[in-house]
Amino acid sequence: MENLSERFNVLQDQLMNIYEAAEQTLEAQIAHWLLLRKEAVLLYFARQKGITRIGYQPVPPLAVSEAKAKQAIGIMLQLQSLQKSEFADEPWTLVDTSIETYKNAPENHFKKGATPVEVIYDKQPDNANVYTMWKHIYYTDADDKWHKTTSGVNQTGIYYMQGSFRHYYVVFADDARRYSATGEWEVKINKDTVFAPVTSSTPPGSPPGQADTDTAAKTPTTSADSTSRQQRSPAKQPQQTETKGRRYGRRPSSRTRPQKEQRRSRSRHRTRSRSRSLSRVRAVGSTTVSRSRSSSLTKAVRPRSRSRSRGRATATSRRRAGRGSPRRRRSTSRSPSTNTFKRSQRGGGRRGRGRGSRGRRERSSSTSPTPTKRSRGESSRLRGVSPSEVGRSVQSVSAKHTGRLGRLLDEAIDPPVILVRGEANTLKCFRNRARVRYRGLFKYFSTTWSWVAGDSTERLGRSRMLILFTSAGQRKDFDETVKYPKGVDTSYGNLDSL
């Protein structure tokens, strides 16, 4: 215990010396993260031994110490790699190499020169959000070579240049869905308006199948599902009220009637799915029998029922029952199923009412068009991407506020590519010829590259090259027009970002 306390105190003294010196060298930052790693390892070891306090310092749980040690190792490896680049002699502060700056958007990049960007929604100064734009961003390419690039802002969002490609790490349309009611925003830097109010009812690259969801998401306190339910319910209520007025012609006899109606409505929703499956199974073997039972039961029982919330299937059965003659209704009211229904009504229990309503609903579900209409309406909001939309987007896909399904739909419209495999010189000659002969049939050509083994730097297989297109149609025209060299094979693909 004393040995651990002494080592911990030595680490604390060394950290304090680094903080007081505040050196702006990369060597000092590497030493700082090395001490943080040793501190996390020491606290992890102490917790394993059951020690909960070292001096005045409480020992955190094992998971916390393990996470901090892994963070320190990751940052230290990145700094050691940066030390071998041409940017090692630049001034580096504790803020520039902190984990908070490293994990800030864009994530896992070293950044310098923070500049606040204010975005005002709906022309209301109180409804604003502040983002960070970085003057310099450092990133590595596929060959682990460090590059230094600049960052910029436009009406779409904040980006940094990766070669000739704009990589957006902040998209204003994502937060406009939450904070804006009209879909307008204004971009300001240092209190100067850079871009006038921009209107975006649907964010760029959003598939048409999500139009309803995006529109509903503009209201902050209302979800898409609740909005769709509120829009569908007013259309059903007048029909139910009108039917009840024609059918019964009187008001509820007590104050507890609305509560009973709510309980019956909830029971109807709980038993709807089970009644559908049972009715489908029965309809396979005895379609005629189920229809005759539904007709006789509907005509005999519905005049005596006092249920107030039954939906469109019940209203349809009532109208059909109303067309029958009184004589026929009297003759069919003596059926055994009617007596069963009366016994369930006299029971008065919530459970009995649920079974009675479910039985009636099972027999009349074969003539009800409601499930088909409802499923059709729900599936229209989550339909897939049409073939004409595939390959339309050429921007990075946003992962915010869309969910897994929304991201899959967004990625379905990513720009298509063709992967070409062959000898390096053959691919280079093919690229040079295609630039001259087939201009306009493609967007970009990549340089030749190869896969590398995980435990060495040895190149695996033949060289590869990517060809980018703006749409699937352009890729099809290119593939049908171009004659590939001998020994070269191709395959299709899509990328979520360039």
Swiss-Prot record:
PTM comment, free text: Phosphorylated.
Gene Ontology, cellular component aspect: host cell nucleus
Region (Disordered): 196-399
Cellular localization per UniProt: Host nucleus
Family (UniProt): Belongs to the papillomaviridae E2 protein family.
Span list, region Transactivation domain: 1-201
Function: Plays a role in the initiation of viral DNA replication. A dimer of E2 interacts with a dimer of E1 in order to improve specificity of E1 DNA binding activity. Once the complex recognizes and binds DNA at specific sites, the E2 dimer is removed from DNA. E2 also regulates viral transcription through binding to the E2RE response element (5'-ACCNNNNNNGGT-3') present in multiple copies in the regulatory regions of the viral genome. Activates or represses transcription depending on E2RE's position with regards to proximal promoter elements including the TATA-box.
Parts of the chain that traverse the membrane: none
InterPro entries according to UniProt: E2/EBNA1_C_sf (IPR035975), Nucleotide-bd_a/b_plait_sf (IPR012677), Papillomavirus_E2_C (IPR000427), PPV_E2_N (IPR001866), Reg_prot_E2 (IPR033668), Regulatory_protein_E2_N (IPR036050), Regulatory_protein_E2_N_1 (IPR042503), Regulatory_protein_E2_N_2 (IPR042504)
Biased composition (Low complexity): 199-228, 280-298
Disulphides: none
Subunit structure and binding partners: Binds DNA as homodimer. Interacts with protein E1; this interaction greatly increases E1 DNA-binding activity. Interacts with protein L1; this interaction enhances E2-dependent replication and transcription activation. Interacts with protein L2; this interaction inhibits E2 transcriptional activity but not DNA replication function E2. Interacts with protein E7; this interaction inhibits E7 oncogenic activity. Interacts with host TAF1; this interaction modulates E2-dependent transcriptional regulation. Interacts with host BRD4; this interaction mediates E2 transcriptional activation function.
Organism: Human papillomavirus type 8
Keywords: Activator, DNA replication, DNA-binding, Early protein, Host nucleus, Phosphoprotein, Repressor, Transcription, Transcription regulation
Bias kind Polar residues: ranges: 229-242
Pfam families xrefs: PPV_E2_C, PPV_E2_N
Gene: E2
Annotated GO MF terms: DNA binding; DNA-binding transcription factor activity; nucleotide binding
Name of this protein: Regulatory protein E2
Region (DNA-binding domain): 414-498
Record's compositionally biased regions (Basic residues): 265-279, 301-332, 343-361
Biological-process GO terms, alphabetical: DNA replication; DNA-templated transcription; regulation of DNA replication; viral DNA genome replication
